[in-house]
């Protein structure tokens, strides 16, 4: 990579003169596109730092990203190959490690093992009834809107976009009240970074109980279908596959909802109905994908990638955001509005993109049908984005609207705050409240 010949100017606040470009911090969060524009001066790949002491090569060019994603023989997903980690050069307390270290699930597996685990997931997800999914999403949407619709204002991110996927996935996976409360506590805590280790233990414990329940009493849900699959997943494999599906589904989908809402509320070209919501989802996936940079790969052998030398075990990361926004992609975008890489590509492409899109579409349509005059409560420039290399996510999305006459003020028990982060939710958590509301 010859960064000196073109002498690109780093974006403001970027300490990248002659070194790796940091993909973290408030400057990157405020304007990641200027970083991607700068990184393109290096060529199809660029040297980056994911957090202090964690180095990677970022693939920023669309065709190079496809080459990486579609060649599982030359570039592996098993992070036990990560050379710098094996050499002790990666800080073990780095905040990015939880999303990169190996776990025995489909995301970090290769070859026949990956095919077995992935097939169980794709076959089970394919059994989801689309009408049931739409109905469940509308019910969850109505419940959440009832919690704040009477107020005339809300943080749409914490009250709606982040909550809705948790509820819908709980229903899809067949969680009873007590287990569902703990699943929601565990996932929220892991992604919020508050007591993450305890939250992970709560999640794994709840998922383990769910698996035991579904082995003895199967139902029409994803958990039961995974257990019944001919892949014959062990209990340990089930825990990791379910945790992967929940974690990889809930957080990105919540951010897709948040980012699409941001787009709909800040671009006058969109109407809050019909096909334009669908168009706004596509535009968000192109220009502001919820997962900006991920898809870790490791060369199986020393060689060359995109014109640059690579060593076996180097960490190569795909920038879905940079690849999607490449200036040379205008023709591809005109040819297909869904040729973006937001769902990744190749054998590790998102297996849940169709249900995720349906959930997003249904949730947004129902929101704007119930609150048609919703608008930002603050100037757009006051909105802030969470720092970090992987997700593109707002901190909050304050809105105002005419209070909904159909929204009922929740009773004190229903409006109770979630359990403190220091302790798991007990009986009467959010999922229990929803099930009680649904039964009325």
Language-model region placement:
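Cytochrome P450
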Residues: 1-440
């Amino acid at each position: 990579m010859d960064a000196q010949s073109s002498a690109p100017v780093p974006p403001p606040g970027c300490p990248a003169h002659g070194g790796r470009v940091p993909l973290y911090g408030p400057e990157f969060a405020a304007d990641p596109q200027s970083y991607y524009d700068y990184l393109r001066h290096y060529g199809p790949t660029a040297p980056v730092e994911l957090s202090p002491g964690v180095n990677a090569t970022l693939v920023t060019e669309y065709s190079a990203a496809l080459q990486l994603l579609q060649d599982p023989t030359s570039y592996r997903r098993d992070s036990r190959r990560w050379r710098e980690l094996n050499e002790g050069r990666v800080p073990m307390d780095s905040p990015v490690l939880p999303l990169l270290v190996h776990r025995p699930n489909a995301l970090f597996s290769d070859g026949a093992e990956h095919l077995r685990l992935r097939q169980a997931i794709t076959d089970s997800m394919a059994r989801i009834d689309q009408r049931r999914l739409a109905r469940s999403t509308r019910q969850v949407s109505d419940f959440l809107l009832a919690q704040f619709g009477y107020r005339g204002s809300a943080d749409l991110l914490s009250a709606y976009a982040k909550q809705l996927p948790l509820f819908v996935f709980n229903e899809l996976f067949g969680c009873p009240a007590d287990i569902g409360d703990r699943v929601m506590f565990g996932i929220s805590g892991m992604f919020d970074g508050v007591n993450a280790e305890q939250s992970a233990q709560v999640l794994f414990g709840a998922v383990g109980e769910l698996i035991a329940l579904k082995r003895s009493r199967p139902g029409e849900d994803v958990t039961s279908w995974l257990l019944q699959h001919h892949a014959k997943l062990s209990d340990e494999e089930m825990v990791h596959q379910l945790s992967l599906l929940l974690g990889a589904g809930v957080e990105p989908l919540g951010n897709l909802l948040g980012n699409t809402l941001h787009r709909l509320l800040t671009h006058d070209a969109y109407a809050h109905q019909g096909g334009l919501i669908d168009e706004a989802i596509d535009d968000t996936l192109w220009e502001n994908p919820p997962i900006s940079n991920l898809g870790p790969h490791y060369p199986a052998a020393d060689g060359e990638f995109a014109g640059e030398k690579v060593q076996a075990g180097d960490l190569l990361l795909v920038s879905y955001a940079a690849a999607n926004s490449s200036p040379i992609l205008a023709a591809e975008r005109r040819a297909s509005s869904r040729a973006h890489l937001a769902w990744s590509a190749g054998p590790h492409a998102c297996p849940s993109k169709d249900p995720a899109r349906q959930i997003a579409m249904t949730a947004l349509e129902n929101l704007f049908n119930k609150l048609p005059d919703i608008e930002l409560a603050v100037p757009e420039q006051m909105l802030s984005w969470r720092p970090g290399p992987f997700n593109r996510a707002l901190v909050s999305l304050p809105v105002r609207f005419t209070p909904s006459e159909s929204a009922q003020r929740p009773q004190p028990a229903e409006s109770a705050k979630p359990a403190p982060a220091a302790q798991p939710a007990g009986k009467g958590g959010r999922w229990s409240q929803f099930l009680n509301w649904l039964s009325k």
